[in-house]
């Protein structure tokens, strides 16, 4: 079904407690060089992952709307992934399944939409301009197409600055889950002007 221009999927309003739970602390201490062999090895270890999944809390804050949802992200192969957003009551608000050349999204009324651009689809249906194409790399702790970034003292991403399509995103990582190997991001915050996107990962399963 073609995408409508102004249809918005309604998620429940953001609760104040969620903002606290998803807060990101800017890492302190000296950073490491992006040219270091440790950083190159970490990137390679992450890229070698064939399958992974994570779940946690999602928050979107702007002057126009404040939204909270639980999310589940599952990558099953190269450019094949599934994103699920649920409201605080556990009901599915959005399910997105992507594979090369085809993206399908089902909303909370069971309506199905198709496109070849997941980022554009989510933006039109939710009103939230989520940089999904870049976020697929950022959520793994990889810079993607960004060349302006900083590392923490453990040779992992601590900050990214990236400009594209009139957006100027700054990504700050608040910590990593060291129970997984390689270590994966535990929480992160994306900002562009008055927009903020917060992700707090409860856990990771990597293969």
UniProtKB/Swiss-Prot annotation:
A lipid is attached at residue 22 (S-diacylglycerol cysteine). It is a lipid-anchor. Its main location: membrane. It is found in: Cell outer membrane. A lipid is attached at residue 22 (N-palmitoyl cysteine). Keywords: Cell outer membrane, Chaperone, Lipoprotein, Membrane, Palmitate, Protein transport, Signal, Transport. Residues 1-21 form the signal peptide. The keyword Protein transport applies. The keyword Cytoplasm does not apply. GO terms for cellular component: cell outer membrane. One of its GO terms (biological process) is protein transport. Monomer. Belongs to the LolB family. NCBIfam families: lolB. Plays a critical role in the incorporation of lipoproteins in the outer membrane after they are released by the LolA protein. This is Outer-membrane lipoprotein LolB. It comes from Escherichia coli O45:K1 (strain S88 / ExPEC). The lineage of its organism: Bacteria, Pseudomonadati, Pseudomonadota, Gammaproteobacteria, Enterobacterales.
């Amino acid at each position: 079904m073609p995408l409508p221009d102004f249809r918005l999927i309604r998620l429940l309003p953001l609760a104040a407690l969620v903002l606290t739970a998803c807060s990101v602390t800017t890492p302190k201490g000296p950073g490491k060089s992006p040219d270091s062999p440790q950083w190159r090895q970490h990137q390679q270890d992450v890229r070698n992952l064939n399958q992974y999944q994570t779940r946690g809390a999602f928050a979107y804050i702007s002057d126009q709307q404040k939204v909270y949802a639980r999310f589940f992200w599952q990558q099953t192969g190269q450019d094949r992934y599934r994103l699920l957003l649920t409201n605080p009551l556990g009901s599915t608000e959005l399910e997105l399944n992507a594979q090369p050349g085809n993206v399908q999204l089902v909303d909370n009324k069971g309506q199905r939409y198709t496109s070849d651009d997941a980022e554009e689809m989510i933006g039109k249906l939710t009103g939230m301009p989520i940089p999904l194409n870049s976020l697929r790399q950022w959520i793994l702790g990889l810079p993607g197409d960004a060349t302006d970034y900083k590392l923490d003292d453990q040779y992992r991403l601590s900050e990214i600055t990236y400009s594209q399509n009139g957006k100027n995103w700054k990504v700050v990582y608040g910590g990593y889950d060291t129970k997984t190997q390689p270590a994966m991001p535990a929480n992160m915050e994306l900002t562009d002007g008055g927009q903020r996107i917060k992700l707090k990962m409860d856990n990771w399963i990597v293969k």
